[in-house]
Amino acid sequence: MKFFLDTANTEDIKHFAELGLVDGVTTNPTLVSREGRDFETVIKEITQIVSGPVSAEVTATKAEEMIAQARNEIKWASNIVVKIPMTEEGLKAVKVLSGEGIKTNVTLVFSVSQGLLAAKAGATYISPFLGRLDDIGGNGIQLVKDLRQVLDTYGFKTEIIAASVRGPQHVQEAALAGADIATIPATVFGKLWSHPLTDKGLASFASDWKAFQATQK
């Protein structure tokens, strides 16, 4: 499973990229706006920190404008993936862009039919939103399982990015459900290596070693 960071904060990206465990980055207009800087500048900086895919979302709502934005965005760096919303206009754009060899990430996927349409349009990635679906009484992890089954059954190469990840449990469950990638907020990424029993075990080892050292004096 690949791990992407879901953030536009370059300091967070640098921090976690140093671990060698970050395979890519996803952004959206909300995340970029929080940085208070020019969109193009932020995206270009991110592409210089990580060599993997960096999703940059279009803001247009019409297919023609999405396509124009996408063609401009891919000029910024070779590892940019154009993020497209799951709408009828978005699907039109994905069909054209995929035909041009431009990688796309269809975002805001909440159903199997949406994911299937995106795959048929040629999307490189689809992003089902786990947390947001859970919020309305749905089951984000079940959606990932269902998407995995459909994509495999019909031979689509589209990869599943588990998005709207709320905690380590989502990451674990997405991996078990067959997601190719989890895109993870920095606050959640920093919790992945933590467990109360790990902390307890380390404290016990340290205490025992300290006691042993005292007997050697």
From Swiss-Prot:
EC number annotated for this UniProt entry: 2.2.1.2
CDD domains: Transaldolase_FSA
Any one GO biological process: carbohydrate metabolic process
Gene Ontology MF annotations: aldehyde-lyase activity; transaldolase activity
Pathway assigned to this chain's UniProt record: Carbohydrate degradation; pentose phosphate pathway; D-glyceraldehyde 3-phosphate and beta-D-fructose 6-phosphate from D-ribose 5-phosphate and D-xylulose 5-phosphate (non-oxidative stage): step 2/3
PROSITE patterns linked to this entry: TRANSALDOLASE_1, TRANSALDOLASE_2
Family to which the UniProt record says this protein belongs: Belongs to the transaldolase family. Type 3B subfamily.
Official protein name in the record: Probable transaldolase
Organism of provenance: Lactiplantibacillus plantarum (strain ATCC BAA-793 / NCIMB 8826 / WCFS1)
Lineage, top ranks: Bacteria, Bacillati, Bacillota, Bacilli, Lactobacillales
